[in-house]
Structure formats: C-alpha cells, structure tokens
C-alpha cells in the first residue's frame, strides 16, 4: 500500500512539474505594456523582463533640459509599471498552480 501511495505522489509531482514548465514558458512569452504620463510613454516587456519596444509621444520630444528630465522620469515610470505587471501576471498564473500547497506567508516560488 505504501508503495502505491508513493508511486501516486511521484506521478502527481511529475504532472505538476510538467504543468509548471509549460506555464513558465507561457509567462516568458507573454507581453505586457507599462505606461506613464497618461500613455505618453509606453514600454512593451516580455515575461522574461526583456524590453521589446519603447514608444514616446512626439509631444515629449524637445531640446529643453527640463523636458529631458521629465522624459527620463516617464521612461523609468513606464519600465517600473511594466515590471510590476509582469510580476503580477506571474503571481496570478502560478497562484492557481500552488493553491493546494501549504506555503508560508510571503513565500515566493523560484520563477
């Protein structure tokens, strides 16, 4: 009886590992868009945190020093927004996978 129970656990673990690998691949290929300045600056980022595209509204293009600082701040804010969205998406998708596990509060999975 113990032998059958262990085999069942091993099978479940293998199935979960396969599901997690598939989900990690889906997350890595997913894209999110971070924005700032009401959409004047946007950043498209993959689940691997690779930046695919940065879009800057033409109205922000200027040679003024003050405008340069504003643009730099908006780009940083858009990047941070994209990173937060990638992390939130990852937590939401993996949350269903780990729902039955007894994990300590604040525990982060290594992916």
From Swiss-Prot:
It comes from Pseudomonas putida (strain W619). The keyword Ubl conjugation does not apply. Keywords: Cytoplasm, DNA-binding. This is Nucleoid-associated protein PputW619_3586. It comes from the Bacteria. Belongs to the YbaB/EbfC family. One of its GO terms (cellular component) is bacterial nucleoid. Gene3D superfamilies: Nucleoid-associated protein YbaB-like domain. Homodimer. Binds to DNA and alters its conformation. May be involved in regulation of gene expression, nucleoid organization and DNA protection. Pfam families: YbaB_DNA_bd. It is found in: Cytoplasm, Nucleoid. Residues 87-111 are annotated as: Disordered. One of its GO terms (molecular function) is DNA binding.
